[in-house]
Amino acid sequence: MAKPLTDQEKRRQISIRGIVGVENVAELKKSFNRHLHFTLVKDRNVATTRDYYFALAHTVRDHLVGRWIRTQQHYYDKCPKRVYYLSLEFYMGRTLQNTMINLGLQNACDEAIYQLGLDIEELEEIEEDAGLGNGGLGRLAACFLDSMATLGLAAYGYGIRYEYGIFNQKIRDGWQVEEADDWLRYGNPWEKSRPEFMLPVHFYGKVEHTNTGTKWIDTQVVLALPYDTPVPGYMNNTVNTMRLWSARAPNDFNLRDFNVGDYIQAVLDRNLAENISRVLYPNDNFFEGKELRLKQEYFVVAATLQDIIRRFKASKFGSTRGAGTVFDAFPDQVAIQLNDTHPALAIPELMRIFVDIEKLPWSKAWELTQKTFAYTNHTVLPEALERWPVDLVEKLLPRHLEIIYEINQKHLDRIVALFPKDVDRLRRMSLIEEEGSKRINMAHLCIVGSHAVNGVAKIHSDIVKTKVFKDFSELEPDKFQNKTNGITPRRWLLLCNPGLAELIAEKIGEDYVKDLSQLTKLHSFLGDDVFLRELAKVKQENKLKFSQFLETEYKVKINPSSMFDVQVKRIHEYKRQLLNCLHVITMYNRIKKDPKKLFVPRTVIIGGKAAPGYHMAKMIIKLITSVADVVNNDPMVGSKLKVIFLENYRVSLAEKVIPATDLSEQISTAGTEASGTGNMKFMLNGALTIGTMDGANVEMAEEAGEENLFIFGMRIDDVAALDKKGYEAKEYYEALPELKLVIDQIDNGFFSPKQPDLFKDIINMLFYHDRFKVFADYEAYVKCQDKVSQLYMNPKAWNTMVLKNIAASGKFSSDRTIKEYAQNIWNVEPSDLKISLSNESNKVNGN
């Protein structure tokens, strides 16, 4: 028997997702039955919940394929300029519900599954997250794909089909333990392998220079097998493609020097070639110069460029003159966006193809290459910038090293001509760093090889121009742009918060889903008490639902009427989960000191993964879980304060916690977070932000008014001034009694009685080498948190501020971001055209 419906679920029945036709439901039930029997070969006596999920996924997929084929035919017929988004990460999460929403099928599927006596939410929970990313960079790529399809751009996402995505995080005895994420174990109903487009990728070997040109010979070959996943736009019949490459050994791998005794070993060694796409490197904002990682970076680039050139040659623009293709139109037909420096090898690879294979003169090849590429910078942290050792590149990609040297020589010649005696500038701007062992600076390669370089929030783009790449922006100021990040409102509002999406639609109509700037219309409801109460009711329902989820999944009971104070993101020193933790201990101490004093109840929720080799991040998790143990088991504290470490934070968990959040923690040291996108998701879902003036927080404050965020702490100039003066942590420790108490407790084993010196590394870091100045912002942070508690006691004032934030969040749609890329970088036009589903064109398409 199905569960009774909540108010929110009842309201969903009169919904912007359209009225369900009876024939639709009957069709879906038929299709579901057909797939259960003929695709899964099961009947209801032996079918499991997972079988029912797969039957539903195949049913929904049936509605995608016609649109997918028609979209590709449409592109083949019309030959629009193509956009290629190259990324080593696509953090997609789950696909089923997003597809139903974008195709307008959710209500019909809901009804069909209900009539079959099943629970659609239970089926949705079966789907594995496609965790092919670490955090913000990979999730941004996923949001961008959704927006590009919704805007009708002829766009493709290209990446790697990792067999194992970001590890699953288990917390054992308070420590993070990593487990492999075998996300493909049960199969993936959304992908289609395309063995007919399999391509060779070369490694190692040597370079041969002859009169007729340059050849890269004696290489090892690995095959790249593409898997295509459909990317549906919202209600526009456009379905674009994400193509992910999987590594396969060629059939003669290690068997060319056939030797009877080695046959079995040669077959077993095929694994070595296929390891390239085995696992995602779990580093966020940290460069690890491993050979396998460099192989991954070249693998995706080499396969993708062959594919792009094949598609270009198949189009009417790929005309031939004599023996070769004319590539003059290439940059008018192809835009390639490099998502960070990970796919930077695309620049020398395209040069290799143009010069060595297509026999173009260097100057022509370079002109085409520069016009084709654009580069997005995502971080200013020095430890995150990619610098590959020259000897490794020479071993793995000898021809590419020669090309990089040639690019660098011509680049430096230009600098010498412009700044004749400035030797230091040459050193600073070279693609090759000579200090110590020689390294290639991949960011410099990207800047020199692209026609546009962008940061991802105004403040970040300013830092990029004035500090990190100052010399380059002085040389070519017009090359540098800002494109503030955004999030897709389909996943981050309609899907994760249907109650709020409905409430908004009732007031301002449904068009905001494709034009989020329309949320400004909500300003006219600021004085509407009934609407504010409805807004609060939606939040309360989300909090209840999340509380029930925590109880079921994590066996923790929380107070659903407490303030939900949430910080969920990768664990990193610069994101300052430690500052949050110090505040938690401060609140605990205040309750203990004066238990009768009024205290606004809080549930502090912290979640995120630490890179497996990042000792300090793992210690921070252990500190949080140790503090939680003490706080949650202290009877004097009761339900006033609870601390939850949210295990295995991922996209599907974000969709649950974000709509339930009251207070969003965005507390990185000013000048360290490039943009952040979690901050935007919380804002759109009716949480208030406590944050520093960093990343996109600055623009959020600009849009909503600084008085409608809880802004605290040092600004960029203050941080610079403190650096100049010299940061002395001890001064703050001695001046602030509450801080001193907290640090002493951590230091003397109050939270680790069995091992009093457990946290000595954290204490040592905080006092002697804290690059992110936690103590410097502690006092301002705690005072700001007191203001948060004050406001929370006044629901009307709180909800008014919430509404102001939601009404101001329209700028942060990834649709707006993508329109800006389209206009200012890619030179393509978004299209409102709803692709016709009739099959008037049956031409073979170029996929």
From Swiss-Prot:
Q: Which GO terms describe its molecular function?
A: AMP binding; ATP binding; bile acid binding; D-glucose binding; glycogen phosphorylase activity; identical protein binding; purine nucleobase binding; pyridoxal phosphate binding
Reactions the enzyme catalyzes: [(1->4)-alpha-D-glucosyl](n) + phosphate = [(1->4)-alpha-D-glucosyl](n-1) + alpha-D-glucose 1-phosphate
- Keyword Electron transport belongs to the record: no
Activity regulation (UniProt):
Allosterically regulated through the non-covalent binding of metabolites, being activated by AMP and inhibited by ATP, ADP, and glucose-6-phosphate. The activity is also controlled by post-translational modifications including phosphorylation and acetylation.
Taking the record's annotation, the residue ranges forming a coiled coil are none
One Pfam family in the UniProt entry: Phosphorylase
N6-(pyridoxal phosphate)lysine: modified positions: 681
The reported effect of residue 796 to R is:
Decreased acetylation
Q: Where is this site: Involved in the association of subunits?
A: 109, 143
Provide the effect of residue 796 to Q. Decreased glycogen phosphorylase activity
State the compartments where it is located: Cytoplasm, Cytosol
One biological process term from GO is: glycogen metabolic process
Which of the residues bear the PTM N6-acetyllysine? Answer: 470, 796
Q: Which cofactor does it need?
A: pyridoxal 5'-phosphate
Binding-site list for AMP: 43-45, 76, 310
Effect caused by changing residue 470 to Q: Decreased glycogen phosphorylase activity
Q: Which GO terms describe its cellular component?
A: cytoplasm; cytosol; extracellular exosome; extracellular region; ficolin-1-rich granule lumen; secretory granule lumen
- Give residue numbers for the modification (N-acetylalanine): 2
PROSITE patterns linked: PHOSPHORYLASE
> Which residues get modified to N6-succinyllysine?
364
What disease association does UniProt give? Glycogen storage disease 6: A metabolic disorder characterized by mild to moderate hypoglycemia, mild ketosis, growth retardation, and prominent hepatomegaly. Heart and skeletal muscle are not affected.
Its subunit composition reads: Homodimer; enzymatically active. Interacts with PPP1R3B; recruits the phosphatase PP1 which dephosphorylates and inactivates PYGL/glycogen phosphorylase.
Summarize the protein's role: Allosteric enzyme that catalyzes the rate-limiting step in glycogen catabolism, the phosphorolytic cleavage of glycogen to produce glucose-1-phosphate, and plays a central role in maintaining cellular and organismal glucose homeostasis.
What's the protein name?
Answer: Glycogen phosphorylase, liver form
